[in-house]
Regions:
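Conserved RNA-binding domains used in RNP assembly and mRNA/RNA metabolism
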Residues: 2-96
Length: 96
């Protein structure tokens, strides 16, 4: 059977802005750090500007997408792979 497509799963730690809506002293606000975020997903595209991760697939579409600026990524590590075949998306094989 012909292989449909393979995607690779990654763990990604990245830096993001942080915000707060409460009132606080200016001196306390000046000490607020950036946020370090963690994303685990399938990397479907990367270039010098961005990494695109998704978590859900149909035979043609993706969902649960996050686009992370490449410059914000601190650590990225490949943790697995998944190969999808045409039969994986045959609705009839899942019906009761």
């Amino acid at each position: 059977m012909e292989r449909k497509f393979t995607v690779y799963k990654y763990e990604c730690w990245w830096e993001d802005a942080s915000s707060h809506s409460e009132w606080k002293a200016r001196s306390d606000a000046a000490k607020d750090p950036l946020s370090i975020c963690f994303t685990e997903g399938y990397l479907i595209h990367k270039d010098k500007d961005r990494h695109v991760f998704v978590m859900s697939f149909t035979s043609e579409d993706v969902g649960d997408e996050i686009v992370i600026p490449t410059r914000n990524i601190k650590i990225i590590r490949k943790v697995g792979a998944k190969t999808f075949y045409p039969k994986d998306f045959d609705y009839g094989s899942y019906k009761n």
